[in-house]
Amino acid sequence: MAFFRALCFVLLVGFAAACQPDCSWKCPPKCPPMWTFYNGNCYRYFGTGKTYDEAESHCQEFTEVGLGHLASIASAEENNLLLTMWKSVRTTTTGGLWIGLNDQAEEGNFIWTDGSAVTFTDWATTQPDNYQNEDCAHMRHELDGDDRWNDIACSRAFAYVCKMSTTN
């Protein structure tokens, strides 16, 4: 009788293990703690001001689900996500938020640090203007609520959002 119970237990455990769902094809990817999932990517806001290059280097340290970069923005919805993340934590009435767009390699040819195509922009009126050799893009918050993009010196320190793709 003990043999029969042991056999039933082994079979039951075996069937239970075989019936576990394989999430690799249907379960949504998960982001690390403190990251926000949206449309196949993970995002995280960092409020400590860094220069553009420092912020990009910090983002590249994150590799939990894909290589991290300063956030690229492909749509108005994604732009609004970043604005919402920023507005929910910012404490000043003016300031900026680094995004992963720059024309450091060639003036006027803006590229995303993650290599994705530039398919959406939200430049403020008269921007980008390259005033005093500005090569890096940030979301600019103005008192009038015009939270749009501006090119600015890469040496300035701003908060930033990192983005990791979950599809790599």
UniProtKB/Swiss-Prot annotation:
Keyword Signal listed: yes
Highest taxon listed in the record's lineage: Eukaryota
Disulfide bond entries: 59-162, 136-154
Gene3D superfamilies hit by this protein: Mannose-Binding Protein A, subunit A (3.10.100.10)
GO MF annotation terms: carbohydrate binding
Cleavable signal peptide: 1-18
Keywords attached to this entry: Disulfide bond, Hemagglutinin, Lectin, Signal
One protein family per Pfam: Lectin_C
Membrane spanning stretches: none
SMART domains in the cross-refs: CLECT
Start and end residues of each C-type lectin domain: 38-163
Binding partners and assembly: Monomer, homodimer and homooligomer.
Function noted in UniProt: Alpha-N-acetylgalactosamine-specific lectin. The oligomeric form has Ca(2+)-dependent hemagglutination activity towards sheep erythrocytes. Its hemagglutination activity is inhibited by various monosaccharides, oligosaccharides and glycopeptides, including inhibition by GalNAc, blood group A trisaccharide, Tn antigen, mucin and asialomucin.
Protein name: Alpha-N-acetylgalactosamine-specific lectin
Phylogenetic lineage: Eukaryota, Metazoa, Echinodermata, Eleutherozoa, Asterozoa
